[in-house]
Amino acid sequence: MVSEITHQSYPLHFVLFPYMAQGHMIPMVDIARLLAQRGVKITIVTTPQNAARFENVLSRAIESGLPISIVQVKLPSQEAGLPEGIETFESLVSMELLVPFFKAVNMLEEPVQKLFEEMSPQPSCIISDFCLHYTSKIAKKFNIPKILFHGMCCFCLLCMHVLRKNCEILENLKSDKEHFVVPYFPDRVEFTRPQVPMATYAPGDWQEIREDIVEADKTSYGVIVNTYQELEPAYANDYKEARSGKAWTIGPVSLCNKVGADKAERGNKADIDQDECLKWLDSKEEGSVLYVCLGSNCSVPLSQLKELGLGLEESQRPFIWVVRGWEKNKELLEWFSESGFEERVKDRGLLIKGWSPQMLILAHHSVGGFLTHCGWNSTLEGITSGIPLLTWPLIVDQFCNQKLVVQVLKVGVSAGVEEVTNWGEEEKIGVLVDKEGVKKAVEELMGESDDAKERRKRVKALGQLAHKAVEEGGSSHSNITSLLEDIMQLAQSNN
């Protein structure tokens, strides 16, 4: 057992660097706990506000005996041109702050270097979010391997890799609306340029940031991926080959949350009472509820959110609708009240204004569908719970995830969104799916057609495979063992 080796021979010490955004931090905290369960000493480096988000979950883990510690560093906000006190991606109020935020999180090299000089035992490996490219310099200085974590699936990572190697495909496109086929892919898949991460032209400072990220990717020792072999075997195999064997699929990492409190508080404390939420779900028929959540950084204009709400109402199906970033959606709150929407749907619609206990909700027997923005965390949680997906991608890797879910795995239905909704440009795009389109998509997903039944059957089977993957002897469990053995050999050869 690797856990025995780490205790008896050379104590492994992994230092984890999560990017300061909710969707990036959540799986990284899960990874910390998974590795600590194998006897690896874990140090998480983050800022005070981000540490506070996960205080309850990590405190329970530490109290249970897991060797996890958190080191807090001050983000140089003002030096990078940010307002004082901004430490999280979600707290950015405008597009203009994105570049300063990226610069700020990558100005931590000097304080982190000092931390490494004082750490004991000496770190044997870095696991870093791909956005924090400065960690490559730390790894090089201290002669330790750096493992990248992208937070994406193998399908998306392979797509990005193939297009980097065949850049003429993107260069020859006449417009951002022109479709192209990804070459050398196990399945025929078409995209437009904006639908692929880092494929569009980036002006000014953004291009420099991208180049730093790509260079850090090239110099990394390997990659861990929050997916499982059985979900996307062809893509996992091809991506591992592209990374010269140094790619380990270790997910779904969310399944390390076995205690009810950990599930309820994964990512943040829920803004609804857990018992109230479960009581509402208990009152609904099995498989009847549509869970609706467009992510922690929902960039959807008010006009579109109104159409979504009216479509949910006209579907006549029970639903839970999570509206996050609530302080940014005051106009929607007013519409809920003034239009009578909240009153009309009160008997079959539960509105959660803020953070929801998503894992608990998806695991409930009354939930039969998940309308999602296709962020990889949410996509994987839905599949792991055996829930078919209604896809509504917005940005970055989410269109890749939609293609995987709808075209390759055939466990989802597209709501019809094909245009990227860039932050700050929501109102320009306006309504992409009207209320009739929403109603039609909900019926297609939740109905009793042969296709709907087949989707439910397929996603249930994939959910069962997810649970087997993380059990002892499963593919993801074995890959964690393989990763630790690899790093152990490196650590011993360096000492």
Curated annotation (Swiss-Prot):
Its EC number is 2.4.1.-. Gene3D superfamilies: Glycogen Phosphorylase B (3.40.50.2000). Signal peptide: none annotated. GO terms for biological process: saponin metabolic process. Pfam families: UDPGT (PF00201). UDP-alpha-D-glucose binds at residues 23-26, 355-358, 373-381, 397-398. Belongs to the UDP-glycosyltransferase family. Possesses very weak glucosyltransferase activity toward 2,4,5-trichlorophenol (TCP), when assayed with high concentrations of TCP. It comes from Barbarea vulgaris. This is UDP-glycosyltransferase 73C9. CDD domains: GT1_Gtf-like. GO terms for molecular function: UDP-glucosyltransferase activity. SUPFAM superfamilies: UDP-Glycosyltransferase/glycogen phosphorylase. It is an enzyme of class 2 (transferase). Keywords: Glycosyltransferase, Transferase. PROSITE patterns: UDPGT. The active site is at H24, D129.
